[in-house]
């Protein structure tokens, strides 16, 4: 006698990495703004000696980045909408450009005191496999690691995503991530940003009303 059954996997407690991809026209507009904003950093003789340069963290307030700032805000809004979060009153708390050069890598880190973080890629080198690595936040998943026949979202303990020009990734600010060694002779240019709710007092209200319980 054979035993017959049906099965299905249910994905719960997900860690959402939200991808936003610009069309070619929008990508050129935004990338031109970013390159104009950071040209002094690119042309600075001192900065050229370094493997990594970052700008001030208030680029979202720059008049030169009007379209880029609007894009970042819209991407954040779409991310919150996708998650069905009702609180859409937020503001960008920090925004800065990163200029990464050959042999630079960024350590494993998170972005504290924010709800959502993002990174937008302005310039990358496809031939050198530019990537960003997100780490599984579940420490228990690193204790026993069987070898899978094929890696997928159900058995992985990390996500290695392509850093592609015109693409932004948005993710929970608590999610730890890192950047592998940059192997290209060309600069990799990205813009990172964080956002936080402005109506925290409404978020912290108790989620129940008056009741009498037996």
Spans of features found by a protein language model:
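A short coil-to-beta-strand element that immediately follows conserved catalytic motifs
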Residues: 85-95
């Amino acid at each position: 006698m054979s035993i017959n059954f049906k099965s299905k996997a249910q994905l719960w407690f997900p860690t959402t990495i939200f991808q936003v991809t610009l069309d070619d026209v929008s990508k050129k507009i935004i990338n031109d703004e970013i390159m104009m904003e950071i040209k002094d950093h690119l042309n600075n003789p001192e900065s050229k000696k370094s493997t990594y340069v970052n700008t001030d963290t208030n680029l979202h307030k720059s008049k030169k980045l009007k379209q880029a700032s609007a894009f970042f805000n819209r991407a954040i809004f779409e991310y919150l909408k996708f998650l069905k979060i009702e609180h859409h009153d937020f503001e960008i708390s920090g925004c800065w450009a990163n200029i990464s050069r050959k042999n630079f890598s960024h350590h494993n880190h998170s972005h504290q005191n924010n709800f959502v973080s993002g990174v937008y890629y302005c310039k990358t080198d496809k031939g050198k496999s530019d990537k960003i690595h997100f780490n599984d936040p579940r420490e228990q998943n690193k204790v026993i690691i069987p070898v899978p026949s094929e890696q997928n979202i159900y058995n992985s303990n990390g996500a290695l995503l392509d850093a592609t020009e015109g693409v932004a990734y948005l993710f929970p600010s608590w999610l730890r991530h890192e950047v592998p060694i940059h192997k290209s002779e060309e600069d990799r240019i990205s813009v990172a940003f964080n956002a936080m709710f402005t109506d925290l007092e409404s978020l912290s209200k108790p989620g129940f009303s008056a009741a009498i319980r037996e």
